[in-house]
């Protein structure tokens, strides 16, 4: 059964492309006709491509991997944030940080810095700092949250990218191509689909168009996550019924002395302040 249909896509305006003079010839296979100087996308092909992409996304989610959603254009930001968050997937809607994929370890350091600042807040280290120092660290935390907060749970490279408007997000697409990360994308008639692995030909400028396609794709991701959860429950049940081992592993992790931990936290706070002054 198809995850969407012609009428739903038509009502959402998914068929409206760009002006003929702005078209990319590589999108010719997905164009149905021209009307009043505007290209009309073949929605029958869009339905098929949505199903194809959704099936692949379901398998990625079922395997426990992450899909990174990218949409920095105004019309798509809010809906992408809502849909991606609903299936616990990371997303970028503010500005694509250069090297987000190709220099991922550096991005992870910035994300870890947020966690460290949160720890300083919770363990009382802030009480030993001046108001000015607290303000500096808080501003640094807010800046990191704005740009990287939505990818805080991304501990490794994503297994796929889902892009809204490959023309605008060309840097993200190039980075994914360079690393061999599959790219799923809503591609309008003015864009080049050649660097996209799963092309969904549709209007990428209308919020409603983006929303109906994300509904289908995120619905598939949700199914994959549910199936993974069910498989885990079955495996745990099977493990409980199996013969238990003789001994249990002991937790040998050493605990840090409180005074030493406070000293380290104070040093980290000082490091944040130094970075802020140098910046």
UniProtKB/Swiss-Prot annotation:
Keywords: Ribonucleoprotein, Ribosomal protein
GO biological process, alphabetically ordered: translation
Renumbered residue ranges of the record's region Disordered: 232-260
CC per GO annotation: cytosolic small ribosomal subunit
GO molecular function: structural constituent of ribosome
Ribonucleoprotein keyword on record: yes
Pfam families in the record: Ribosomal_S2 (PF00318)
Family of this protein: Belongs to the universal ribosomal protein uS2 family.
Protein name stated in the entry: Small ribosomal subunit protein uS2
Organism, scientific name: Phocaeicola vulgatus (strain ATCC 8482 / DSM 1447 / JCM 5826 / CCUG 4940 / NBRC 14291 / NCTC 11154)
Gene for this chain: rpsB
């Amino acid at each position: 059964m198809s995850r969407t249909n012609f009428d739903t896509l038509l009502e959402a305006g998914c068929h409206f492309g760009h002006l003929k003079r702005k078209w990319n010839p590589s999108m010719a296979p997905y164009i149905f006709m021209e009307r009043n100087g505007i290209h009309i996308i073949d929605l029958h092909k869009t339905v098929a491509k949505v199903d194809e992409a959704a099936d692949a996304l379901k398998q990625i989610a079922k395997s426990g991997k992450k899909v990174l959603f990218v949409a920095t254009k105004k019309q798509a930001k809010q809906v992408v944030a809502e849909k991606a968050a609903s299936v616990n997937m990371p997303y970028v809607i503010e500005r694509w940080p250069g090297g987000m994929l190709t220099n991922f370890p550096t991005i992870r350091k910035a994300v870890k810095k947020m966690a460290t600042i949160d720890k300083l807040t919770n363990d009382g280290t802030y009480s030993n700092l001046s108001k000015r120092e607290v303000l500096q660290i808080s501003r640094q935390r807010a800046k990191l949250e704005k740009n990287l907060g939505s990818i805080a749970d991304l501990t490794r490279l994503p297994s796929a990218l889902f892009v809204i408007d490959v023309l605008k997000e060309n840097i993200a697409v190039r980075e994914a191509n360079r690393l061999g990360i599959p790219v799923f994308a809503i591609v309008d008639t003015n864009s080049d689909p050649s660097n996209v692995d799963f092309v969904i030909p549709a209007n990428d400028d209308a919020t409603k168009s983006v929303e109906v396609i994300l509904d289908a794709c995120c619905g598939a991701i949700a199914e994959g996550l549910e199936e993974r959860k069910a498989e885990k429950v079955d495996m745990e049940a099977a493990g409980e019924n199996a013969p238990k081992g003789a001994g249990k592993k002991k937790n040998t992790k050493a605990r840090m002395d409180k005074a030493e931990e406070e000293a380290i936290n104070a040093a980290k706070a000082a490091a944040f302040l130094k970075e802020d002054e140098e910046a």
